Curated annotation (Swiss-Prot):
Molecular function GO terms recorded: acetyl-CoA carboxylase activity; ATP binding; carboxyl- or carbamoyltransferase activity; zinc ion binding
CC terms in the record's Gene Ontology section: acetyl-CoA carboxylase complex
Domain CoA carboxyltransferase N-terminal: 27-284
Pathway the protein acts in: Lipid metabolism; malonyl-CoA biosynthesis; malonyl-CoA from acetyl-CoA: step 1/1
Principal subcellular localization: cytoplasm
Naturally occurring in which organism (per UniProt): Exiguobacterium sp. (strain ATCC BAA-1283 / AT1b)
Record's protein name: Acetyl-coenzyme A carboxylase carboxyl transferase subunit beta
Coiled coil start-end: none
Gene coding for it: accD
Length: 284
């Protein structure tokens, strides 16, 4: 009976917390698609592709190492352009910070290389640097690389990864859409092959210029590709867009891409395309 009149406790015992595991930073990488936790080393050995098919972004040098013959890449010197043409506040400090963090001069790396002995000019954008945005340096580097390819009679393979035009450079940035397009037009008139390889993300002014001007336009699986953002389009047209809108697969279904190529097939695909076009020279 005494237990019946006994006052109940107003608290509950707390479960003892499990000790926190002090894992080294960068040891594990979580897939944003399937949420699986990978050992970063194993993920890198798998060319940063998850078992679910998600393609993690590659750094410019990682993609070059995976693509071209070992020791064949000859990097072109960067163009001489004014770093801050509009004197935008803090812009130069941000560029310096990105250079230290990424180890590259700007958001694109261009050079001459070979794939199984087949010569080509390759340009790779790196979204770690200012989100791969296109300013005067990026535009002129790509245009100069394309002009070099034209003079040497070589095909061009360009990997895009960009948030679009660089806002800190205003009209100077937008001019690069025309600059790169003109260089590619001259390359095309010389009867040479240009393959645009779109990776995640390819948006804005880049998607509206050289990213979609290839003789072959291909993309990695799941890549976000588009000009304006999804929300802006939905607000403008006042309609709900499909779930897979602006993905590589959606563009392929719509006829805006020629193929969606898994990263493991990238090198063999490009080799085959260059061989099919007589080493990148198209007969006109």
């Amino acid at each position: 009976m005494t237990a019946f009149f006994k006052k109940p406790k107003r608290y509950m015992p707390l479960r003892q917390r499990e000790p926190k595991i002090d894992a080294p930073q960068g040891l594990m990488t979580k897939c944003p698609s399937c949420k699986y936790m990978h050992y970063t080393k194993q993920l890198n050995e798998n060319h940063k592709v998850c078992d679910c098919g998600y393609h993690f972004p590659l750094h410019a040098q990682e993609r070059i190492d995976m693509l071209v013959d070992e020791g064949s890449f000859e990097r072109f010197a960067g163009p001489s352009v004014k770093a801050n043409p509009l004197d935008f506040p803090d812009y130069e400090e941000k560029l310096t910070k990105d250079r230290k963090r990424t180890g590259i001069e700007e958001a694109v790396v261009c050079g001459k290389a070979t794939i199984d002995g087949l010569p080509l000019v390759v340009c790779v954008m790196d979204a770690r640097f200012r989100m791969g945005s296109m300013g005067a340096y990026v535009g002129e580097a790509i245009a100069s690389a394309v002009r070099t390819a034209t003079s040497l009679g070589l095909p061009v393979v360009l990997f895009t990864a960009s948030g679009g035009a660089r806002m800190q450079e205003g009209m100077v940035s937008l001019m690069q859409m025309a600059n790169t397009s003109i260089a590619l037009k001259e390359h095309d008139e010389a009867g040479l092959l240009y393959i645009a390889y779109l990776t995640h993300p390819t948006t804005g002014g880049v998607s509206a210029s050289f990213a979609m001007l290839g003789d072959l336009n291909v993309a990695e699986p799941g890549a976000l590709i588009g000009f304006a953002g999804r929300r802006i389009i939905e607000q403008t047209i006042r309609e709900k867009l499909p779930e897979n809108f602006q993905t590589a697969e959606f563009l392929l279904e719509s006829g805006q891409l020629d193929a969606v190529i898994h990263r493991e097939q990238m090198r063999s695909f490009l080799k085959k395309m260059i061989e099919l076009h007589d080493g990148g020279v198209r007969h006109v």
